[in-house]
Structure formats: structure tokens, C-alpha cells
Design a protein with these regions (language model features):
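Conserved AMP-binding/adenylation subdomain of ANL enzymes
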Residues: 215-234, 242-283, 297
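Gly/Ser/Thr-rich phosphate-binding loop
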Residues: 281-286, 295-358, 370
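AMP-binding/adenylate-forming catalytic core of the ANL superfamily
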Residues: 105, 122-124, 284, 393, ...
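ANL superfamily adenylate-forming
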Residues: 8-9, 40, 130-188, 203
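Conserved beta-loop-beta connector loops within the AMP-binding
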Residues: 336, 372-390, 423-427, 473-475
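Conserved adenylate-forming
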Residues: 65-69, 176-190, 194-237, 257-259
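N-lobe entry segment of adenylate-forming
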Residues: 1-65, 70, 76, 89, ...
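Conserved AMP-binding/adenylate-forming
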Residues: 44, 61-108, 446
Length: 479
């Protein structure tokens, strides 16, 4: 059993996420601190105080005009945007449960997501409305969800048949309300957010996070790596808000520590790096393919990235050669951090810190996290021997939405079974070496083989289907 070397954060169990964010200000940032600016229109901004006020007023509108009740699911289907952030906070403030859906999802995939989530409201980007409508035509949900079209005034097409966000909400005369109150309840049992993950196998499942989970994640980040997660952090942000990594780092963290984030609708390599240079970003977030390209790309040598002190890579471990290449490019003091996690553990299993790096290791357990490494019979394995990674901690998810069987099978004696194979060295550093689970990782995205097989087998001329691995050295995929 391996415990975190960092202090265990004290996670409150009697506040909602909104109450926590309203009452805690670790870097004492002023209310007028600009925390969000749009990637495509930098004049569109949001301060800490504006985010809170809008959440309080929009929550009132959700309750009075849309009938949103505690625990109701609101799906957000759209790319990263300031409106996405504002929606999530309004839903939390009202006591609802927001559910992110990847904006690249097809109508076929949406039918599955909507069936699992059973939303009372679907907030959809105006450009994606036809796709959402197509999916809803194919479904027979218990109740028909109300549609809310998301689009800022500068780019939203007017949809006469549906209310719009934020336009119609901003014109509302609703008075702000107090945040969802959990002062006399156990926040470990109250859902706050949801995203989709394939888990260890099968089709994507709705991973439900409690208010306790999300608060614990924020505290874990801060305690484990305060050098990076603070008010002085600046970044252009492309990881999808529909995934837990994007939810916490891009949606919740700025509302807590007051760091500056520019949401990027869709990742584009050169525009991302150019904006990081212009913004004087302190952090780069990369997947292995982008990291490898940076090391080899002579076209970016003229960009000033001297403000970057940390590179965070997730999706798969970086090779030692890529880590060294990034340090040559950005400076020898740059922290290149391999992160590891899964949606069900809120991505805080193992973290490097500024002063604790070891090649392509994924680090040590984050604050408050305990890890076991076991063989196929769930016996502990010795140091240096591969085994499955099992996890305990306050960031471990609440449940799979409406799926008690899969929820139960994800645990063994209270430990979350990750399905990932790791080994630990004599210094307590973890190394990710493989996967037991049936899951393909492509550029940071999860793809379940069973989904690919189902699509292939739907063709009348296909009798059977399977997959095999293929290595791409230019994307740093393993042999």
C-alpha cells in the first residue's frame, strides 16, 4: 500500500461546490480579477465577481422558468466557451447536476448519452442543434427534455423556437439567489457533475461526481502542486470541458484560485502555441502527439514561450527523449510533468510536483490518495513488479448513472480497480506500463473496442470484426 507523501487535505462534507467557491479564496484575489477571456474574441471576458453574480441570477432563471429541481441533469453539448463555464456554475448554484458531452459526438453517440443521462434540459451550441434534434427523434425518453440554445450575441443564429443562453438569461428580471445549501447534509451523497467514460470496458458510462468529489479534487491539486495551481497561472485551454480534466482545471479552478483561462473551442496546434506566446502563458497542456511535434517542429522556434514554467502531459506517458527535447526547447528548468488518472478517480491518482520529477514516471500518489498494486489474485506485488493499480481517496467517483452492476464491479473491497498496469520503483515513483482494460487511447480520447466492432458489424457484408495495435513513432505511441 502506497500513501501520498503530501499532507492530506481536509475536505468539507457540509457545503456544496458553489458554497465552497464562494467562501474560499486561497490567493486572496480581488472580485474584479479577470479569470476568463474568449480565445476567438479576447474582448469577451468574465471576472470572478461577474461569474458569481451571473451564476446566482441564472440559477434563479433555471428554477423559475425551467423548473430545474435538485439533482436534475442538464446536459451541455458544445465546445469550450465562456458560456459553457457560466452554464456549469449556474447549474451547480441551482442544485442541478451538469453533464458534459463532447461536441464531436455524432447523433448516434448522442442517443446513448441522452439515454444514460436522462436530462431534464439539454443546453446545445447553436451550430450543433440539428445534431441534437436528430438524436432526440430516435429516442423515447421518460420525459422530453427542454432545449436551450447556447451562443453569444456575436455568433449565435437566432432560434425563434428555443430560449437562448446567455442572451435570454441576461435579459431576465430574476433576482439572484443564494447558492445550493448543503450545510446540514452529506455532500458525498449529492451529485454535482457527470461525464462519460468507458471505464474498464464496454460502452461509455455516466460517471457521477458528488460535490465532495469536486471539492476534493480542487484541494488535492492545490496541496499537491501549489506552484502551478494558483492565481498567477495563465493559459490557453483546449482540453474538453466535457471531460473531468477540463471540468476541474478549466471550469472550476479559475472560480476558486482566480487564475486566467482562455477557453479554446477546438485544438489547433499552431494557433494554440501562438496564443500561449501572446498570453505569456505559464502552463502548456499537451498530449503526447503534440509534445513530439513541438520537439521536432522548427516552425515554432521563433515563438517566445519563455513564460512557460510547466508542461502538463496526459493521455499517455511521454518518452524520456520527448521530455529531454521539451526541456531543450523551453529551458532546462521547465517542469515537464506526466500526469495519470481516470475519470472515475477524478484524475488525481498520481502527480509530479515541481521538485519531484523522474524521467517518464507519472510521479507519486496525489494528496489524500492511497494506491495498491496487485496481481491477478489481488495480492500485493513487490517493488519493481507490474500489477494492477487500485485506488482509494476522496476524489473517487460516486457511481455510474443508473448502473448499479457496473458500479459494483468497478470496486474490490472498497478499492477502485483502474484496469491500468503500473510498477513502483525503490523511491516510490510510479510507472505506467500497460492496460488490462479493453480501451484504446487516441490523442487523449477514449475509444471502446466494442463500439468500433458494433459499428463495423452493422454493415450487412461484415461477419466479424476485431482490432490490432499499430505503432506510430511520430505520435510517440508504444511499440
Amino acid at each position: 500500500m502506497y500513501h501520498s507523501p503530501y499532507p492530506t487535505p481536509l475536505v468539507p462534507s457540509d457545503v456544496s461546490v458553489s458554497q465552497f467557491l464562494l467562501s474560499s479564496n486561497p490567493d486572496d484575489v480581488p472580485p474584479d480579477q479577470k479569470i476568463l477571456s474568449d480565445f476567438d474574441n479576447q474582448q469577451q471576458t468574465l471576472t470572478l465577481q461577474e461569474l458569481r453574480f451571473n451564476a446566482a441570477r441564472d440559477a434563479s432563471t433555471f428554477i423559475s422558468r425551467f423548473g430545474l429541481q435538485e439533482g436534475d441533469v442538464v446536459c451541455i453539448f458544445g465546445p469550450n466557451s465562456i458560456s459553457w463555464v457560466a452554464l456549469a456554475h449556474a447549474i451547480l448554484w441551482a442544485g442541478g447536476c451538469f453533464c458534459g458531452i463532447n461536441f464531436m459526438a455524432t447523433a448516434y453517440e448522442l442517443t446513448h448519452y441522452f439515454t444514460v443521462a436522462q436530462p431534464s434540459i439539454i443546453a446545445v451550441d447553436d451550430e450543433l442543434l440539428p445534431k441534437a434534434l436528430e438524436a432526440l427523434k430516435q429516442l423515447k425518453l421518460r420525459t422530453t427534455p427542454r432545449l436551450l440554445v447556447v451562443g453569444d450575441e456575436s455568433n449565435a443564429r437566432k432560434q425563434e423556437d428555443y430560449p437562448r443562453f446567455p442572451l435570454d438569461f441576461r435579459s431576465s428580471k430574476e433576482s439572484p439567489i443564494q447558492p445550493f445549501d448543503l450545510s446540514r447534509r452529506d455532500n458525498r451523497k449529492i451529485p454535482a457533475g457527470m461525464c462519460f467514460s468507458s471505464g474498464t470496458s464496454g460502452k461509455p458510462k455516466g460517471v457521477v461526481f458528488s460535490h465532495h468529489n469536486l471539492i476534493a479534487y480542487l484541494l488535492t491539486l492545490r496541496v499537491t502542486n501549489p506552484f502551478t495551481h494558483n492565481a498567477y497561472m495563465r493559459e490557453a485551454f483546449f482540453p474538453s470541458f466535457a471531460h473531468i480534466y477540463g471540468i476541474v482545471s478549466g471550469v472550476l479552478l479559475p472560480a476558486w484560485v482566480g487564475n486566467h483561462v482562455q477557453p479554446m473551442r477546438k485544438f489547433e496546434y499552431l494557433p494554440y502555441l501562438r496564443r500561449c506566446s501572446e498570453l505569456k502563458a505559464t502552463v502548456l497542456r499537451l498530449v503526447p502527439a503534440a509534445a513530439v511535434r513541438m520537439v521536432k517542429d522548427t516552425a515554432i522556434r521563433d515563438l517566445d514561450l519563455s513564460s512557460v514554467h510547466t508542461v502538463m502531459c496526459s493521455g499517455a506517458p511521454l518518452s524520456d527523449a520527448t521530455v529531454k527535447g521539451l526541456k531543450r526547447l523551453l529551458g532546462p528548468e521547465t517542469n515537464v510533468l506526466n500526469g495519470y488518472g481516470m475519470s472515475e478517480a477524478t484524475i488525481t491518482l498520481l502527480r509530479h510536483t515541481r521538485n519531484g520529477q523522474k524521467g517518464s514516471s507519472v510521479g507519486k500518489p496525489a494528496a489524500g490518495v492511497t494506491v495498491c498494486v496487485v496481481d491477478d489474485h489481488f495480492n500485493d506485488v513487490p517493488i519493481g513488479i507490474e500489477g494492477e493499480c487500485l485506488v482509494k481517496g476522496p476524489t473517487v467517483f460516486m457511481e455510474y448513472k443508473n448502473n448499479q452492476t457496473e458500479t459494483a464491479s468497478a470496486f474490490r473491497d472498497g478499492w477502485l480497480c483502474t484496469g491500468d498496469v503500473v510498477k513502483v520503483d525503490e523511491d516510490g515513483y510510479f510507472w505506467l506500463t500497460g492496460r488490462k482494460k479493453e480501451l484504446i487511447k487516441y490523442k487523449g480520447n477514449q475509444i471502446a473496442p466494442v463500439e468500433l466492432e458494433a459499428i463495423l458489424l452493422s454493415h450487412p457484408l461484415v461477419m466479424d470484426a476485431g482490432e490490432r495495435a499499430r505503432s506510430y513513432r511520430e505520435e510517440d505511441t508504444p511499440d
